[in-house]
Amino acid sequence: MGKSVMNTSTEEKIVTALFLCSDKPNEVLAALKPEWNNKCELSIVEKLFIINYSLLIQNVFPWKDELSEGIDHEKFCESFFVQPDLFLRLRPGKEKMVKQKLQQAEIKFTIVSDSCLALPNASKVDDVIELDNEAVIQDYSSQQTGDFMDSAIASLENNKPSVWDCCAASGGKSIMMYDINPNIDLTVSDVRESILINLKKRFTKAGIKNYKGILADLKGPLFPFSTSNFQLVIADVPCTGSGTWGRTPEQLYFFDQSNIETYSVLQKKIVSNAIPQLQPSGVFIYITCSVFKKENEEKVDFIKENFHLELIQMEVLKGYNKKADSMFVAVFKKNL
């Protein structure tokens, strides 16, 4: 609930949170607040009226002025009382097999698209399917960034484009790019060696054998390769992660607003070192899982002003009405 009910007892906060987050009656609420228990199926707005608190939904996420354009602040706040889904991206050729395995294990799922399934968040799929080989656990909005990558790869008119995932982290987007075009000449980098070790294991499961893994700190200017080396650069940069806080709601209470500027400075350093590696006519894709404009639209302005790339497309991927994360993606082209 963020800081929306600061002047109440801990017990009252717990009971209120349980009521707001429950979608069906339960024994705990029946014991503590029976008059609320049979009203769990009501909407968040109706529940807020019932509790008769000075709880302002807008104060769940009090940084409204920092939000990217187009985000409905009230709907975004309401989404924190709904458990996000677990999303699977089905790998090419494995779609039917995965669905059959889930059905046999009596695991409920909803078909979002041909390659995307939504499951209850607590679903145990590890023992049912071969993760990374048959399907990848990947949020819906993160999967949507694949559409931008697909268009970018197609625009390069090269069956084996050189691609650099410069902030590879868990490698989900690299696997997705490989599924879009298995012929890509893939380079992944991260500042942490442990990440590259884990990537190697994950790529082995995913069947990705031909790639380069490089330890690189993009906060500094030193690189293990020359400039203008890649046709496509993906920068899924470190950020506040504010678009994912439905999965880590404690951030609503503990987040320090000064961290927005801290990450903004870091993002400028990363893109300033990554963009020079882009070939003429190449494509640069900037991605965050943030809802803050300083990390999103203001970074687009920074890139346009300092590197003179052409903005092809940018979009806030609103996941708050889909039980998913919210993200931001911008696509640029380096003209000749």
PLM segments and residue spans:
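S-adenosylmethionine
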Residues: M1-L336
